[in-house]
Amino acid sequence: TIPAEVRFLSCEPLLGPVDLTPWMGEREWTQVAPGVRTRQGPLVDWVIVGGESGPGARPMHPDWARSLRDQCQAAGVAFHFKQWGQYVPVGQTEHTWYNSGEMMYAADKATPMRAIRLKSKHDAGRQLDGREWNEFPEVTL
């Protein structure tokens, strides 16, 4: 184990499905000596997720981000959705679309195909299923 008050994973760019459940869950603090504590239990306190941006950016399938959000929610782990990157799922920001851009489809063997649209990082936004996910871990000093 690595001694740290908060352990986090930055899953960006998220380019495939990830299962973090073996490393999530509740932890207990144990005092091992006066003024010295250690934690027992899973290794992740916070998960940050984001798509890829910039030249040559590859799309992130929406279900990959949803899966990590759902894993975090089930385990009580803080989840922060940083960005979609250059692509946004069709229907995510219908009201801000213009008649320019490219359509693509993101899919892999485990998840169904989804239409996505090339956008600027700013226009793609930060909402996942209608809300921003700005959770931060609770730190006990």
Task: Briefly describe each language-model feature range.
Residues T1-P3, D70:
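Short, surface-exposed basic-aromatic patches at helix termini and helix-loop junctions that form
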